[in-house]
């Protein structure tokens, strides 16, 4: 069940890893060699994963509340992804045991191509909304909501949320570029079927690859246009730090 009467205004930046600067030259296969990132190599519940309809189900329940903020937005481009800071709002997740946890949104960001795969196939773009446990201070990462975009599976029409976030590219395409604007999440979430999702325990997909993360990836694949997708992929085209220009996605 989901309540979506909210509008969110956000600050967009590009994320560095929690444990320092990193790159995608080997799609994350070299991260575990750096002190503090050992889980990236030796963890037992690492993400991303391959999602299949028969393996992960909607046996758990989520409830997204209407506490996300609105206001002015500063959007900046830096190193590894477009990241949008939320700062409040969140959702409740009810587990099979009957227990529940409240999660507070921190930020959302993008990977192209997707990190999680569906039946072995990468989607064109994946968005992660990262949350902390609402009861912890300082922040302890606790949950990620994942959304897939693909021109073939979801359609090649323009996506309103992607259009709003990608306004930053109108001001330039280099690290440090900033602009002002608003990003509205209500219309985006209204377009998503939140009754069908995969739910699993995993990790952060960037260093230090912390585990114990409650993942929810919605099964509906959403539309994105070729023009919108290109604005993201152009960030790492011909850049050796992004697997030779092939993307900012971790492979496990």
Language-model-detected regions and their locations in the chain:
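Alpha-carbonic anhydrase
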Residues: 2-252
């Amino acid at each position: 069940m989901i309540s979506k009467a909210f509008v969110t205004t956000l600050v967009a930046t590009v994320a560095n890893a929690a444990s320092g600067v990193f790159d995608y030259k080997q799609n994350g296969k070299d991260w575990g060699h750096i002190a503090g990132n050992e889980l990236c190599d030796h963890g037992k519940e690492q993400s991303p994963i391959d999602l299949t309809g028969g393996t992960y189900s909607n046996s758990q329940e989520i409830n997204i509340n209407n506490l996300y903020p609105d206001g002015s937005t500063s959007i900046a481009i830096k190193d590894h992804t477009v990241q949008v800071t939320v700062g409040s709002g969140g959702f409740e997740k009810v587990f099979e045991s009957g227990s529940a946890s409240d999660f507070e949104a921190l930020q959302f960001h993008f990977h192209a191509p997707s990190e999680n795969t569906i039946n072995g196939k990468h989607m064109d773009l994946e968005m992660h909304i990262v949350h902390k446990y609402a009861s912890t201070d300082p922040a302890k990462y606790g949950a990620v909501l994942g959304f897939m975009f693909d021109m073939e599976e979801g359609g090649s029409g323009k996506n309103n949320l992607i259009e709003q976030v990608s306004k930053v590219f109108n001001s330039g395409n280099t690290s440090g570029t900033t602009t002002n604007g608003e990003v509205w999440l209500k219309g985006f979430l209204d377009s998503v079927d939140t009754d069908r999702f995969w739910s699993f325990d995993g990790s952060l997909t960037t260093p230090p690859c912390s585990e114990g993360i409650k993942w929810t990836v919605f099964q509906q694949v959403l539309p994105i246009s070729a023009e919108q997708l290109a604005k993201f992929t152009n960030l790492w085209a011909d850049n050796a730090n992004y697997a030779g220009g092939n993307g900012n996605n971790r492979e496990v």
